[in-house]
């Protein structure tokens, strides 16, 4: 009986570590498929990514509603160093809730460009809620999403999304991003703050190299 608890704990740690790597792998695929398909939207996104300070990749956001709508998903945050290289990822959860007469299911992939230090700092400050900070401008562009390239120019945050489902579009307004410290700890083997991962870049996991390479391919 004394062996059960340690083995269970070990299995739990392995599951969490695997979940973190799977999220990184799915994020890599999202970057590749959304930015590498040759469409005008992909080309526009690539231009913004080349100027971005950081990027948030959410490989799957699921939204469902029947009178009460909810939205959520898991994401990774990666920032660009002064040298141009990309950091390893910090892990985040995204969630929001809305009320209204809405029936349907929506599935979306999202790439969110943080265009400057102001946007990155706001994102790193505890919970970040889109639309809550009047000093942070947000533009949303993408298939099934309202917006235009023109409105994105000069925005602090630019969101590209590929949406599917019964809703006509997706709005990230009101979405709250929170750091997933458990995934960070499991992925890097230590208790670590998101700033140490994406700002001072004191963490490394070779499993994130394909994601970093994919961002370098499209974003320089």
Residue ranges of model-derived segments:
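Small-residue-enriched, tightly packed secondary-structure blocks
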Residues: 11-220
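Sec-dependent N-terminal signal peptides
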Residues: 1-2
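C-terminal motif of bacterial Sec signal peptides marking the signal peptidase cleavage site
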Residues: 6-9
